[in-house]
């Protein structure tokens, strides 16, 4: 199962590499700026004292690989394209760069961050607020499913940073509730998700309304060639910090598969795992909203305490469920890919792919929920005969070997 992808596999790793190489070399080095400096401590980065206080209070001790290379060029006002896997402090990289450059005397929006989902936008807002706690930063998340009038009230009272989803942000700009005059930093987070799906036109529309001289940061866990191509229109000689696919191993997360003969037997396998393992907190991924509801009912009928969230639920319900999960009062969360990127919970030790993702790229976003910030994590993939091709695709895409679940899995958690 760990070998090459079977004939007819839907993912062509060689084609991906050749497209990426062609794209990156298409304009030689004229398109990019090189920036090779690495900073092994936050203290060496020349950051404001009160920003350092916020970074250390948040729990960071030393910078991750992407932070060592990515914070300073952003602080210097350079355009940047940065790729790093989930759980490596990517969000804190651009938050630090923004917080370092804000004029706190000016209570106008100076930085705009776009994210693909409400949950992720709200997570970024929390990180920005926490890191900027000693700086007095004012941040607001503009997302769908919330009161337009409340957004307008908060924006009119003055904020330094707006984080949001493209639809609501464009609406606020169109209504002139969000004024772009002082915006000097524009960040796209999870650019792969936004640029390769339906948000492309909205991002263009937003960009047209921003001042001509603006710093642009593009951050993502995966960077498809199509996403890089679009950034050319926005960016001026960006610094490129790319992690090759063979480095996207999600260090510290042990990855296993369990062979399940029939789809119907996955439920028994799942219940067996929960009865034998002592799990702090875990996330279970399935591929459809209907299956979230079905699996939640089945687990509860067997006396397992689980909570569930998916895109059909209203925003208030989703917020309450995520709050309970973050606080630890709920220990098992069942969800879909849609919400994978907004789940940032420190104590998650196990991710179970009840269904394998339909795209190799989404595997990274799912299993990056475990082992956050250097903690140990385990991911377990349920694999039927129909899933073998996708498992091979995932292994080739990330250049990893996913081994069969050992008998002593309890020792790994």
UniProtKB/Swiss-Prot annotation:
The role this protein plays is: ATP-dependent RNA helicase which is a subunit of the eIF4F complex involved in cap recognition and is required for mRNA binding to ribosome. In the current model of translation initiation, eIF4A unwinds RNA secondary structures in the 5'-UTR of mRNAs which is necessary to allow efficient binding of the small ribosomal subunit, and subsequent scanning for the initiator codon.
| EC number(s) on file | 3.6.4.13
Instruction: Identify the residues that the record assigns to the Helicase C-terminal domain, covering every copy.
Output: 252-413
GO terms, biological process: cytoplasmic translational initiation
* Keywords from the UniProt entry: ATP-binding, Helicase, Hydrolase, Initiation factor, Nucleotide-binding, Protein biosynthesis, RNA-binding
Motif location (Q motif)?
40-68
Q: Which family does it belong to?
A: Belongs to the DEAD box helicase family. eIF4A subfamily.
Question: Which reactions fall under this protein's catalytic activity?
Answer: ATP + H2O = ADP + phosphate + H(+)
Where does motif DEAD box map?
189-192
Could you say which residues bind ATP here?
84-91
Q: Which terms in the Gene Ontology molecular function aspect does this entry carry?
A: ATP binding; ATP hydrolysis activity; RNA binding; RNA helicase activity; translation initiation factor activity
Q: Per the database record, which ranges form the Helicase ATP-binding domain?
A: 71-241
Q: How does it assemble?
A: eIF4F is a multi-subunit complex, the composition of which varies with external and internal environmental conditions. It is composed of at least EIF4A, EIF4E and EIF4G.
User: How is this protein annotated for GO cellular component?
Assistant: cytoplasmic stress granule
Q: What InterPro entries has UniProt attached to this entry?
A: DEAD/DEAH_box_helicase_dom (IPR011545), Helicase_ATP-bd (IPR014001), Helicase_C-like (IPR001650), P-loop_NTPase (IPR027417), RNA-helicase_DEAD-box_CS (IPR000629), RNA_helicase_DEAD_Q_motif (IPR014014)
Q: What is this protein called?
A: Eukaryotic initiation factor 4A-9
Q: Which Pfam families match?
A: DEAD (PF00270), Helicase_C (PF00271)
